[in-house]
Design a protein with these regions (language model features):
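Acidic helix-start/capping segments at beta-turn-to-alpha-helix junctions
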Residues: 43, 193-198
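Alpha-helical cap/lid subdomain in secreted, periplasmic
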Residues: 1-106, 110, 114-125, 206-235
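Gly/Ser/Thr-rich helix-start
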Residues: 109, 157-159, 196, 226
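Serine-esterase "nucleophile elbow" of acetyl-processing enzymes
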Residues: 137-192, 209-220
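Short, flexible loop/turn segments with low-complexity composition
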Residues: 125-139
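Short clusters of hydrophobic/aromatic residues that line enzyme substrate/ligand-binding pockets
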Residues: 97, 160, 201
Length: 235
């Protein structure tokens, strides 16, 4: 082709050929390449769809084919995260992106990074997976649930949950809320955290734990504001 801006001729290769070059040059250095499919966009098959649009017939497919041809590991990041997005639903997925449908927010970046780690763990015999930190399994959130009973979750700041120990220490109201409910009919769990704003509660993954424990019929009582007027990433 001729480059419009310079008038100089240049050779342009396919996506697959560029990927093969990366793989071969990595191997030539004695390093180990791993191919990923690209992250999913905030794009649904249509306006009423509950399915994220995949790239398994274009760039995702071509990356997989290169990996197979070059005998290197492949992680389908697109599929792993897209499946999560579909469980989250459209409204929550909006918080995963920043400005446009491609570039993620901090929340979305963490979801993609977690998906990448999941994919690496799933590659049989991949030494790199041994260097990943152990997966932390949340066994606390929702643990008070009894069959047929809803759970009341509280989230918020130090006025909802504090030291909550001695009569002469600071207490949050969420720590005593259970005293006002008939706990033979409902469970009450306080997942607030002192010093948190609505943003940092989300940013630290605390909301995800509650969100993942929610079932139809549950309640979430939320109170933030004391720490939301400060610096964006503190409080």
């Amino acid at each position: 082709v001729t480059i419009k801006e310079t008038g100089e001729p240049d050779t342009v290769y396919t996506y697959g050929e560029y990927m093969r070059r990366f793989v071969r040059e990595v191997k030539a250095k004695g390093a180990r390449p791993i191919l990923f499919s690209l992250t999913p966009r905030n794009a649904w098959d249509d306006k009423d769809s509950t399915r994220i649009t995949r790239v398994n017939k274009t760039f995702g497919l071509w990356a997989r084919q290169v990996a197979e041809a070059e005998n290197v590991p492949f992680v389908d990041l697109n599929e792993i995260t897209a499946s999560k997005f579909e469980r989250f639903g459209k409204e929550k997925v909006k918080t995963m992106f920043y400005i446009d449908r491609i570039h993620t927010s901090a929340f979305g970046a963490r979801v993609n990074a977690e998906s990448a780690a999941e994919g690496l763990r799933g590659v049989k015999g991949l030494e790199l997976a041994q260097y990943l930190l152990p997966v932390e399994i949340d066994t606390k959130t929702g643990s008070s649930r009894k069959p047929g009973r809803p759970v009341v979750f509280t989230i918020g700041d130090s006025t909802v949950k504090n030291e909550d120990k001695d009569d002469d220490s600071m207490w949050g109201w969420g720590s005593v809320l259970h005293e006002l409910f008939d706990t033979t009919k409902v469970s009450v769990e306080n997942h607030a955290m002192a010093g948190r704003s609505a943003r940092t509660f989300l940013d630290e993954g605390r909301w995800d734990k509650v969100y993942n424990a929610l079932q139809p019929g549950d309640y979430v009582i939320m109170q933030f504001g004391h720490n939301d007027g400060g610096d964006i990433n503190t409080g």
